Amino acid sequence: MREVLVVSESVELAEEYYLSFNKFSSGSTSLLGQVTKASFFSSLASSGTKSLNTKSFGLKSLSLKSLNTKSSGLKSLNTKSSGLKSLGLKNEFDYLTFEQVKSSGLEDERYELILVVCDDTDDFYGEKGLANLTLFHNSLLPNGKFVLAVPLNSPHEEEMRKELMYSGLVDVASCAYYLTKFITGVRPNWKAKGDRKSSSIHAAPIDGYISKAPDYESCSTKPRACANCTCGRAERENLNSTDSNANSTDFNANSTDFNGVDLTTNSKDVSGVDLVVDVDAPTSSCGNCYLGDAFRCDSCPYKGLPAFKPGEKVLLE
């Protein structure tokens, strides 16, 4: 069963409009789809419905404020004596006044068709109009149709068409007949800002592109640098050894050096200290041992001895 809502000020007027649209929808083309002026009203003229007089299908029969039940033929649409079933009307519709819609609201995604008969267009443009149209939009099912019937001389037709689009309706169109304007729109079958499926393509973990770095090894706790030292200790030891050799002075035991001092025999300097060449003296790792305690390491074997020239060892008497 098709869900239809008709909003107007009287149930008689709602019945007449619903009967008109239902009679048209029984043809090959429905107003609920593409609305055209010629097809819609030619269908009404040839429908054979005595209760619908196309010559008087103007503002007096469609307008809310100027509705005259005696001249519009609405008595023939009384639910008790109209014989709607004999006219082929099989679908029921919900009826509400506009005040009831604004006070109680509408259920979301319920109706396939919402027909609003309105004589006061102030409720359908501007900020108030957008709120009202959004209410009707949300109550439509996907691909549901919205039809707004307003007076032909309404000065805000263009504004109302825009408000229908702003509310989310698409395929907005309008057609006129005598003193009535029909503005229609369709709710799309998609939702703005709807949930989008995430991509099914997943990137490979970055660990698959980057090789793992080897574990860091340190030989700081070992007596000497490792053969494959990676902590820098081997480089430091090689550098210190090079500096020590550069600062050392080669000497010949058979020659004299250090201002004529004979290095092959014991001799005394002016302070009475014996100067003896020690060819087996420990090798300095820093190269600063001969400069004195101020330049020596804490573990220096020459700690406490006076400064001396490179290649000599001081022996106290």
UniProtKB/Swiss-Prot annotation:
Keyword Mitochondrion: yes
Pfam families: CIAPIN1
Sequence segments annotated as region (Fe-S binding site B): 286-300
Location (main, coarse): cytoplasm
Domain of life of the organism encoding this protein: Eukaryota
Region ranges (Linker): 193-216
Sequence positions that bind [2Fe-2S] cluster: 219, 226, 229, 231
Positions occupied by motif Cx2C motif 1: 286-289
Location of the protein in the cell: Cytoplasm; Mitochondrion intermembrane space
Function (record text): Component of the cytosolic iron-sulfur (Fe-S) protein assembly (CIA) machinery. Required for the maturation of extramitochondrial Fe-S proteins. Part of an electron transfer chain functioning in an early step of cytosolic Fe-S biogenesis, facilitating the de novo assembly of a [4Fe-4S] cluster on the cytosolic Fe-S scaffold complex. Electrons are transferred from NADPH via a FAD- and FMN-containing diflavin oxidoreductase.
Subunit (UniProt): Monomer.
Comment field on protein domains: The C-terminal domain binds 2 Fe-S clusters but is otherwise mostly in an intrinsically disordered conformation. The N-terminal domain has structural similarity with S-adenosyl-L-methionine-dependent methyltransferases, but does not bind S-adenosyl-L-methionine. It is required for correct assembly of the 2 Fe-S clusters.
Family (UniProt): Belongs to the anamorsin family.
Protein name: Anamorsin homolog
Organism: Theileria parva (East coast fever infection agent)
Lineage: Eukaryota, Sar, Alveolata, Apicomplexa, Aconoidasida
